Amino acid sequence: MDTADIVWVEESVSAITLYAVWLPPRAREYFHALVYFVCRNAAGEGRARFAEVSVTATELRDFYGSADVSVQAVVAAARAATTPAASPLEPLENPTLWRALYACVLAALERQTGPVALFAPLRIGSDPRTGLVVKVERASWGPPAAPRAALLVAEANIDIDPMALAARVAEHPDARLAWARLAAIRDTPQCASAASLTVNITTGTALFAREYQTLAFPPIKKEGAFGDLVEVCEVGLRPRGHPQRVTARVLLPRDYDYFVSAGEKFSAPALVALFRQWHTTVHAAPGALAPVFAFLGPEFEVRGGPVPYFAVLGFPGWPTFTVPATAESARDLVRGAAAAYAALLGAWPAVGARVVLPPRAWPGVASAAAGCLLPAVREAVARWHPATKIIQLLDPPAAVGPVWTARFCFPGLRAQLLAALADLGGSGLADPHGRTGLARLDALVVAAPSEPWAGAVLERLVPDTCNACPALRQLLGGVMAAVCLQIEETASSVKFAVCGGDGGAFWGVFNVDPQDADAASGVIEDARRAIETAVGAVLRANAVRLRHPLCLALEGVYTHAVAWSQAGVWFWNSRDNTDHLGGFPLRGPAYTTAAGVVRDTLRRVLGLTTACVPEEDALTARGLMEDACDRLILDAFNKRLDAEYWSVRVSPFEASDPLPPTAFRGGALLDAEHYWRRVVRVCPGGGESVGVPVDLYPRPLVLPPVDCAHHLREILREIELVFTGVLAGVWGEGGKFVYPFDDKMSFLFA
């Protein structure tokens, strides 16, 4: 339209969500979507604005990652999600479809209206004939708006048949119960209507509280008015493809921009029940287009996910952040979540790597980037394999010392390389959104050294992106391999031998007098600078331009190192007694105690190596190792009744016992099982021990006796592996260290 006809306002946008999706008449290969903006002006007054975007089937498939999706399927799913009374959890059916839908709609929005920035001053232009936003521009009418929080606590008692949960888990044995609960609610939505609910919301200006014995009836207790919390706003619109104007009815938050919910008390079913109640209330009257009611989070995946989040894709229209209630840095975590939300247009972590580029765009970017590299690096890329040992001078078991040893790392190197390679291969992207997405990746890399939230996003974004594109994983792995080769070449010229690592982090020993600390300090610094310079030169020669100057960090200096496996290594500085243990599993409190025993024992054992009779040293070392195991077991005996101490974390990808039927009766406790499951073995009597998920039962725990012997045998196997490696590495012994637990100590736990 003619820009002279646009009506401009100066506002900021605090949230963008999906309102409606439809097929225009006779359309088969594209759909339209209505997007809701929560805006506010310089005075803080809220405004509801809308934009209409068009998305083609090709764009949808690019973001979906395959051709197995159609615009008709997307529209059908979105239409079903507008009736939460019948379909309150539509994204459970296909979370990937909803990720693709949300990502491609946001991409279309920026392509068709201009890049949108959250909480930043903007000029927003609307077409007065349609009431729709058609243009967005950055402005400088004021400082960025500070996001405002409201504290939300919601608890619901949703009566779900334990047999329904058991049926879901029987279909998916690796399922997490947070997903199973939502799946059961999806299958029987009437149980959400009968739920009891308690909610408390505190904003900067209001307190809102409700208590429902059942959501089918009015609350039995109430404090504060709904109007103090939100404003119900109706806006007349004339979207394309509609014969007449439609009315959008939305909520505008008053004096806040997002909800914060304590992680330990957060319950996705409770929040869905609350928002469902609001949706039903607000849209009870006819005359308005019903909005999409859809969410994403680890609970919406069968196997869950390790990081909790709750993404609001549609109604009510603004985000909810979950943070651990006991975290000392809870305030910083909330600020970080809000910053990540603003930086990534509200799409992270809901859409994953799609926040940068659609999955189908990455192979072309990776191929173009690889074509820009020098032949030697291209060869390293072609040879790279995930199982390849990149740096492994010492084959475990091995021990070195006394000799000056150092650990180094390139902080954030993989993320920097990803951004640089994406920029190298993305210059030919036809889609402007591609360049916008790459610019967001750049901004994250630039912010990461000073902003912990950006580093946390990159820690997940890099592997997510590589998982979405094997060619990109190959490229990044090959470039890291080339970095490793340069590290090894440079090390040989600076009295340094690299013993292990992967390029991003590595360690090695120095050819310096073990007694001369000053000389060692100088040589280590010379090596650090030389490697840093050489790796930087290799990357620049391949046109890989990092966003930050390459920095090789010294993580520790030691005098001894013991390696017992590819990942297992212990470093010790006998001068100041500092150490570092890597590769020992810390699956629970008992494992953490065992790690402390291992570290203390290794210090004592390596202190023997100055003696003159190696054979006697080895015998003495075995005695010290057995004594250490004795002490560990005697200490464990004092904790034999402590189920928390013996619990171990199990991921969905690890084999575990079937859940006992009583585990399905935990109610809202099950909502917290997003990914990790803490299991303790117990002896119910009359048979073998079984694994019990301790977090699925109320406190205080009432359980059969803990099978401490089972847990100790698993822990002792890890300790035996370490001690065997020490004996072989230091004294060249070929025999294993085996602690005689069954003969010596098992009677304590009989």
Curated annotation (Swiss-Prot):
Q: Name one Pfam family in it.
A: Herpes_HEPA
Subunit structure comment from the entry: Associates with the primase and the helicase to form the helicase-primase complex. Interacts with the origin-binding protein. Interacts with the polymerase catalytic subunit.
Biological function = Component of the helicase/primase complex. Unwinds the DNA at the replication forks and generates single-stranded DNA for both leading and lagging strand synthesis. The primase synthesizes short RNA primers on the lagging strand that the polymerase presumably elongates using dNTPs. The primase-associated factor has no known catalytic activity in the complex and may serve to facilitate the formation of the replisome by directly interacting with the origin-binding protein and the polymerase.
The record's InterPro entries line, in alphabetical order, gives: HSV_HEPA
The GO annotation for biological process reads: bidirectional double-stranded viral DNA replication; DNA replication
Q: What is this protein called?
A: DNA helicase/primase complex-associated protein
Compartment(s): Host nucleus
Q: What is the effect of changing residue 612 to G?
A: In strain: Nonneuroinvasive mutant HF10
- Keywords assigned: DNA replication, Host nucleus
Signal peptide (from-to): none
- Please state which protein family the record places this protein in: Belongs to the herpesviridae HEPA family.
* A GO cellular component entry from the record: host cell nucleus
